[in-house]
């Protein structure tokens, strides 16, 4: 559900919740920092999970299923090899993006690439975005963009990479089933932004590097450093953020906003549907290789085979 806030004299969104993304173990020896999708912040419609991950071979995320939502993988350092039961295979390299619609079902793996040219740490972000009931069982699909093809612009000490949506007339190539804005900002010391956000969309900031201030510079604002998630309240249509650090370091953060779906949501691990009955059907489909999971029956990723898993 949307998070509301007290009205203010301006249209600037204020920070109503601040969370530190604690480390936890996922997959095969992998460590993630989870902010959305943990017990005290389960769901922020339409966002299900936000993980900042760090993996080094042989750790990773071997063969696992999904149904009913989308995953957005954005690499910050290193590269990840992706394989799925449909025969799709590719590498998400540093600065690159994969926007995967799991739809009615996919089984895939995400592991550090064996061709990482000596890179020992592979870091990135993975965001899960819910789909409406009419889109949950669409055919799986991918949108993949290399770093050089992501829309990017720089002005007045502010660099922006447009992952989804647009900034100052610069538009992303990504088509979003659930309307979403995803911007990667880097602010040099002393610089600031005033970024429009659709009035009724839920929005958050996640800080990747440095120390910044978010909110209304004249009324109320929150300071945050790396690994902090800031939930922005409703009641405004603008984010103000600035790098007031004396350290001389840049401030890097993502701003993500999405239109709430407003439907019932039931999640069981990697399956996200609208009712418990649909979850039970999904588990049955997966275990019996039906209705979207047919090709998973005899499939095992090359990465899992190399590690002797499954």
UniProtKB/Swiss-Prot annotation:
Gene3D superfamilies given in the database record: Jelly Rolls
GO cellular component: nucleus
Keyword Nucleus included in the entry's annotation: yes
Family: Belongs to the pirin family.
Entry keyword annotation includes Glycosyltransferase: no
Chief location bin: nucleus
Keywords: Nucleus
Subcellular location(s) per record: Nucleus
Protein name: Pirin-like protein At1g50590
Pfam families, A to Z: Pirin (PF02678), Pirin_C (PF05726)
